[in-house]
Design a protein with these regions (language model features):
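Intrinsically disordered, low-complexity polar regions and short flexible loop motifs
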Residues: 2-152
Length: 152
C-alpha cells in the first residue's frame, strides 16, 4: 500500500513536469504557431519539396526519415527535452508496483489522454528515426499512438 502511494506521488509529480514542458512547446507564440506546429510545418514543407509521389514506399519512408533527421539537426532540436521527459514518464508508468499489465495501462492511458494530434504525429516521426532508441517498441507495445489520425 505504501509503495503504491509513493509511486502515485512520484508519477503525478513527474506528470506535472511533463505538462509544463508540453505547454512550452504547444503554447502559441506571437506568430500564432507553437514550437511544435513550426517543427511539423518545416517537416511537411521539406517533404513536399522532396516530391514523394514518384517514389516507392520504401524510398518515400527513407526520404521522410531523412527529412525528419535534417529538421531535427537544423533546429538544434528544441524538442529533445520534451521527448526525454515523455519517454521517462512512460517508462515510469510501466514500472508501477502493480502485478498486472491492466493496472499499468491505467497510467499509460492517463498519459495518452493528454496527447494532442501534433504530439502524436511528432512521436510517430521520432519513432521511425535513428533517434528512436527503445521508444518505437514502447509506443507500439502500449498502443500510445492509438488516436493518431490516419490522415497524416
Amino acid at each position: 500500500m505504501m509503495k503504491m502511494q509513493q509511486f502515485d506521488s512520484n508519477f503525478y509529480s513527474y506528470f506535472n513536469i511533463y505538462l509544463e514542458i508540453k505547454t512550452t512547446i504547444t503554447e502559441k507564440k506571437s506568430n500564432g504557431k507553437s514550437i511544435l506546429n513550426d517543427f511539423l510545418s518545416q517537416i511537411s514543407n521539406n517533404l513536399q519539396i522532396s516530391q514523394l509521389s514518384g517514389k516507392s514506399e520504401y524510398e518515400a519512408y527513407e526520404t521522410a526519415s531523412q527529412e525528419y533527421c535534417k529538421t531535427v539537426m537544423s533546429n538544434n532540436f528544441v524538442l529533445s527535452h520534451y521527448f526525454r521527459t515523455f519517454y521517462r514518464l512512460a517508462t515510469l508508468a510501466l514500472s508501477a508496483p502493480i502485478g498486472d499489465e491492466v493496472g499499468k495501462m491505467k497510467y499509460v492511458k492517463i498519459i495518452r489522454s493528454q496527447l494532442t494530434e501534433e504530439e502524436l504525429l511528432v512521436l510517430y516521426y521520432n519513432s521511425h528515426s535513428r533517434y528512436a532508441g527503445q521508444s518505437r517498441q514502447l509506443l507500439y507495445e502500449y498502443n500510445i499512438l492509438k488516436h493518431l489520425s490516419p490522415l497524416h
